[in-house]
């Protein structure tokens, strides 16, 4: 999975449906040392910015997710993105068991979040974000992109 992957939410009735896309979420970046940039946003055309997930208390985000789909949220986020920038990778990729199957998982460093991945083909992965203590899952798709452009 090493490289840059473009993300796309899959509508499922989860509170975060449409939130990441509204805030110009690009996807995720996986490094060869099993570390990852969990939240990668497009700041300007041709410029990707890794965001530190721990600046957003996940329970508060889930409670007020509808605000994240507004024009105001998009504007605020675009101005505050620089302050939210990660200083380095924010998650670790490991093997984890889901429904008795071993699968790749991205464990966030300072959030109770794990993203589980299933390979669709060489260039596409299905993802499921799980927040500890919350029965709802956020589903997304990742498409491999050419690193040369970034």
Each model region followed by its residue ranges:
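Soluble ligand-binding/transfer domains with enclosed cavities or grooves
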Residues: 1-150
């Amino acid at each position: 999975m090493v490289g840059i992957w473009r993300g796309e939410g899959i509508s499922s009735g989860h509170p975060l449906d449409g939130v990441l896309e509204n805030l110009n979420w690009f996807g995720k970046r996986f490094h060869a040392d099993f570390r990852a940039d969990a939240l990668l946003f497009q700041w300007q055309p041709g410029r990707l910015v890794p965001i530190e997930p721990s600046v957003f208390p996940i329970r508060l985000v889930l409670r007020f997710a509808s605000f994240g789909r507004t024009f105001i949220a998009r504007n605020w986020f675009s101005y505050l993105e620089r302050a939210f920038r990660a200083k380095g990778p924010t998650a670790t990729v490991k093997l984890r068991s889901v429904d008795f199957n071993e699968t790749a998982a991205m464990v966030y460093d300072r959030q109770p979040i794990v993203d589980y991945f299933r390979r669709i083909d060489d260039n596409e992965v299905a993802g499921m974000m799980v927040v500890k203590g919350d029965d709802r899952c956020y589903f997304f798709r990742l498409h491999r992109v050419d690193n040369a452009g970034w």
